[in-house]
Amino acid sequence: MLLSSFKHKQQRLESDCLVACVEMVLEYLHVPITYTQIVKRLRAESFGTPFGNARFLTALGLTVTIEYEGTVEIFEPYLAMGLPVIVNVKTIGWTHWQNEETYHAVVVVGIDYDNQLIFIHDPFFSHAPIELTFTTFLVGWEEQRRQYAVIGLAELYE
């Protein structure tokens, strides 16, 4: 399962990975908002944005679910509803980062159980989606207690 119409955006600053992830998700959901408005809404700082600040998007009438201890199985139901999942990770062992380790946010847009692959949009890079094995993905996600966020339109949940 892959959200094929998901449009990739690259982060504008080294510290705005969460802002870029939210921008991608909101554009995918057809929520009219500018990058500058997202920066303000998330209370982004020059050193980064706390992952939990995604909760401030509820002021826009959106639903925001932020949880810890997620599993790869949580992705499928959200993706089936057309909802990408933002995950909080550390890039430990992620080959496309060439052994650089940093705290980061990426968007999960697909999962392939048969081949044990996760497809992500990593806003630090210009190309997407990037595929990671379950094992590689989980090492980085575990570092952040498998935290994830799902942003949705209120009518999707009614």
Per-region residue spans from a language model:
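Active-site-adjacent structural segments surrounding the nucleophilic cysteine of cysteine proteases
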Residues: 1-48, 71-72, 91, 99, ...
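A structural signal for well-ordered alpha-helical scaffolds and beta->alpha junctions
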Residues: 18, 49-50, 68, 130, ...
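Extracytoplasmic/secreted proteins, especially bacterial periplasmic and envelope-associated proteins
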Residues: 20, 24, 52-55, 136
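Noncatalytic regulatory segments and standalone regulatory/sensor domains
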Residues: 44-46, 58, 80, 90, ...
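Helix-adjacent hinge/juxtasegments
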Residues: 55-83
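Structural recognition of the beta-strand scaffold that forms the well-ordered cores
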Residues: 65-66, 85-88, 119
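Short beta-strand or tight-loop elements
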Residues: 104
